[in-house]
């Protein structure tokens, strides 16, 4: 029998992992671009039009609805994905070392408190860790509430994520179409001129929130404003964002619902939001500066809480540097497997021009297997960037209710290796 991520998935007709790989781009060092959360108490969508139009890869969590019925199995399966399971101990959002496995998360509309509660404290912490490690976050309606600390009615909900460390305000507006204006200095104008009039018509709104300028925290920015005179939301933030520092991901909250539109300025709006979140992705971190003659073992598991020495995940890069001395005749970089872990494809790259990536590195070894060597004759003195890339990944299998992981599930908990410069 073929291994599956969740062999008991057939017990539930509610949860699926839907995968659309429009443009797998391993040079970025992420497994996929977007993870769309349509879990418990959220709208479950099969695809995101903006991801399709931007040619971004996406995977989606879908669960049961009130009309179809929600069972304990739905909760167990959602949290097996997001919190962890035997195949993936720290969950689908994170690599074994805690780095983000996706470039960003998108959270659908629905009921924020109920979804946050369903995530459990451990699941909410996975989202916080994802953003802290550099993953982006975009949420609309319920997803916007969920990002915040709380609201004017209750400034601190334990069910919320608090990745935007401030409050929002309930617009008290249901099932209406609203207009949106684009401030002249909005960063979203980098991606679209929105027809030249800085105005977007007929964006659906159903219980969403807004950001009062008086409540905007330092470092946050309002990207779009409501144009709806009958309500206090008028002239206040419709979409706002926050990036805590250079190493964290950008968090963006959107009160209304542009996400399902397939053409026109409302699609432009959603595309611009996604692109600005992705623009906030920080540069990868260097694991260590290697010393010639000193092997470095990357064998720790997630539970060891030692990211600098933790195993590599699927489609992930580990980056290193080494200082090449004057007069060096030959430089050898060796990648070695540990017993029982030979059957993985790890690539080796080196570059003097910044981070060593597939497609841009002068020196490379992309042979099959893990054990390999890269030899550089007469290397120039200076800083040489090295990287290890794990090309082994899971496969996806289409099922009636979506796509499951199959094949190399073992890679999800990471591949250990040793790297040595001589």
Predicted regions located by residue number:
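Non-catalytic extracellular/lumenal accessory regions of secreted precursors
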Residues: 279-330, 406-414, 418-422
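Bacterial N-terminal signal peptides
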Residues: 9-16
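Noncatalytic accessory or regulatory domains flanking protease catalytic cores in secreted, cell-surface
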Residues: 346-420
């Amino acid at each position: 029998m073929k291994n599956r991520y969740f062999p008991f998935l057939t017990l539930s007709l509610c949860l699926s992992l839907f995968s659309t790989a429009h443009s797998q781009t391993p040079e970025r060092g992420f497994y996929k671009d977007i993870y769309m959360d349509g879990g418990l108490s959220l709208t479950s969508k099969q695809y995101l039009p903006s991801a399709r139009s931007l040619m971004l890869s996406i995977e989606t969590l879908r669960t049961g609805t009130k009309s179809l019925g929600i069972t304990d199995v739905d909760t167990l399966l959602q949290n097996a994905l997001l919190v962890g399971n035997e195949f993936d101990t720290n969950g689908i959002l994170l690599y074994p070392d805690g780095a983000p496995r996706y470039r960003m998360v998108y959270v659908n509309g629905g009921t924020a408190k109920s979804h946050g509660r369903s995530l459990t404290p451990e699941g909410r912490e996975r989202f916080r860790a994802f953003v802290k490690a550099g993953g982006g976050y975009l949420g609309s309606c319920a997803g916007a509430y969920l990002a915040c600390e709380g609201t004017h009615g209750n400034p601190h909900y334990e069910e919320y994520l608090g990745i935007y460390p401030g409050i929002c305000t309930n617009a008290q507006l249901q099932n209406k179409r609203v207009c949106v204006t684009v401030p002249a200095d909005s960063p979203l104008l980098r991606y679209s001129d929105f027809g030249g009039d800085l105005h977007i018509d007929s964006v659906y709104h159903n219980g969403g929130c807004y950001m009062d300028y008086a409540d905007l925290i330092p470092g946050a920015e309002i990207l779009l404003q409501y144009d709806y005179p009958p309500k206090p939301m008028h002239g206040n933030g419709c979409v706002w964002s926050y990036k805590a520092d250079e190493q964290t991901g950008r968090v963006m909250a959107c009160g209304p619902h542009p996400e399902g539109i397939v053409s026109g300025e409302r699609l432009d709006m959603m595309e611009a939001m996604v692109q600005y979140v992705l623009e906030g992705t920080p540069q990868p971190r260097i694991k260590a500066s290697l010393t010639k003659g000193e092997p470095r073992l990357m064998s720790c598991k997630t539970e060891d809480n030692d990211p600098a020495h933790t195993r590599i995940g699927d489609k992930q890069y580990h980056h290193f540097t080494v200082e090449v001395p004057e007069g060096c005749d030959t430089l050898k970089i060796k990648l070695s497997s540990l017993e029982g872990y030979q059957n993985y494809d790890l690539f080796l790259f080196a570059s003097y021009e910044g981070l060593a990536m597939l497609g841009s590195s002068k020196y490379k070894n992309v042979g099959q297997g893990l054990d390999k060597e890269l030899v550089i004759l007469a290397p120039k003195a200076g800083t040489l960037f090295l990287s290890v890339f794990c090309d082994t990944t899971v496969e996806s299998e289409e099922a009636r209710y979506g796509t499951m992981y199959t094949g190399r599930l073992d890679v999800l908990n990471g591949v250990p290796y040793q790297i040595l410069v001589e």
